Amino acid sequence: RKQCFDKFKIGNCKDCFIGIRKDTLDGLLIGDSFANHTAAFLDVLAKDARLYIHDSAAGGYPLMNNVNEDGSARYPEKYAIDRLNYAKKFKNIFIAANWEGMTENKDRTLTLKTLGELIRIGKKIIIFGALRSTSDINLHRAKLAKAKIPVYLSERDFSTTEYKRPNNYIVYEMKRKFPSIIVINLNDVMCKNGKCKIELNNTIVYRNSNHLNTSGAILLGKAYLITHNNPLKELNFKQHN
């Protein structure tokens, strides 16, 4: 999957697809680096729902491209525009991004405006809510413990706090403004009673403080399907009725 992230390519479905290959695509996954690490999670759900999804992601391009406070584009706009126009060909659009990092008013405004436009033309939007961040030092200690390196660690619980996200967290804003969107919250698997695990099946799922590793994303997808109905099956059902 070396052609799927930061290559600014669109439509290279043979190189970059998720789920079950079929004659026609069921949708497109777009976003920034969070979309890249969510792909393996989505692959588990897509295979279970028998969906065929293409993905195209690049850093700094959550839905469109990040913008400065004066409204100017932080990165070249062509990829964002071309990717969005391509996405409009499909009924289902999957979006994963660093939503916690989206605090600038101009970024938020552009994202919500674009989402509204997609919903108005009949697109089904599926948003992925990212895991709570851990700290680099916590992750480092967990890896030391996992490697059985003989170091003294005063704390062996490497779970992270399920800190409260602000009321204006953009995923909450999306759901308030556009109730029809589906939000798949990865925290539902990892967090309980105010604590969030960083491991599944004795495997650390984080690559760094806020990104999943591939094996962790796959485990997360499998764990999600054990405790939740697969929301993507509803998409497949609607497309065939």
Regions found by a protein language model. Give the residues of each.
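Extracellular/periplasmic envelope-modification machinery, especially enzymes
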Residues: R1-N241
